[in-house]
Swiss-Prot record:
Segments for region (Disordered): 106-145
GO biological processes: cell morphogenesis; division septum assembly; regulation of cell division; regulation of cell septum assembly
Biological role stated in the UniProt entry: Cell division inhibitor that blocks the formation of polar Z ring septums. Rapidly oscillates between the poles of the cell to destabilize FtsZ filaments that have formed before they mature into polar Z rings. Prevents FtsZ polymerization.
Organism the protein comes from: Burkholderia cenocepacia (strain HI2424)
UniProtKB keywords: Cell cycle, Cell division, Septation
Protein name (database record): Probable septum site-determining protein MinC
Domain of life: Bacteria
InterPro entries linked: CAP/MinC_C, MinC, MinC_C_sf, MinC_N, Septum_form_inhib_MinC_C
Organism classification: Bacteria, Pseudomonadati, Pseudomonadota, Betaproteobacteria, Burkholderiales
Amino acid sequence: MSLKKSPFFELRSGSVDTLLFTVKTTDLDALRAELVKRFEATPEFFADDVVAIDVRRLADGERVALADIRQMLNDVRMRPVGVVALATQGWAGEAGLPLLEARDRRAPAAKPADEAEPAAVPAVETAAAPAAAAAPEQPSEPAPTLVQAGGQTLVIDRPLRSGQQIYAKGDLVVLAPVSHGAEIIAEGNIHIYAPLRGRALAGVHGNHDARIFCTCLEPELISIAGIYRTTENPLPADVLGKSVQIRLEEEKLMIEPLRLT
């Protein structure tokens, strides 16, 4: 076999970031209902994002129909690309998806039966659930936060950390940083008077007149009425990290510098 380098292709080691969809229940009906609830307001939020199904949090002896979970994720427009499992979960390779090795911290061992969360309560690490559904497992990891306002302006004056989510039925005003992995969603306009490093979605019910205003734009994703842009398409230097307004014009996101003086 020739070892001469080909001018047409190259094979080399590398790594690709994906979302982890961590399954914590074998009740697929409850899991499906939670997914629908999570994405019904923002169906475009993770559209076309690649995701790995993580089953390491299931208790010893538990197993799920990965083909069904794969279809659930397809139904919400996510793209399952593999499965992350423990060495003892040999069944995880039966779904036709490749087994992947995650480089995150190792999943904690399952709780004893008398301490475990009820199986009927679904939980997904990427989903935001009401605070009463489950207590955070580790104090260092913030629980997802969902705040709804009945049509009026919602003001948030605390920093938002990874995994936290804010949802406003009207306009949303944020006075503190939005970290990577945090999500702010509004049916109206979004105003951020701090760095935006997470995701911001305005006009999520199809309000094409909604706008996003930000004093320091460094986002993972921005979206208005389902039209979105991610960091895969780098922002121009004249708006990256700057004060901007974002609006829609003929189904295209317009990102414009704000003149504050």
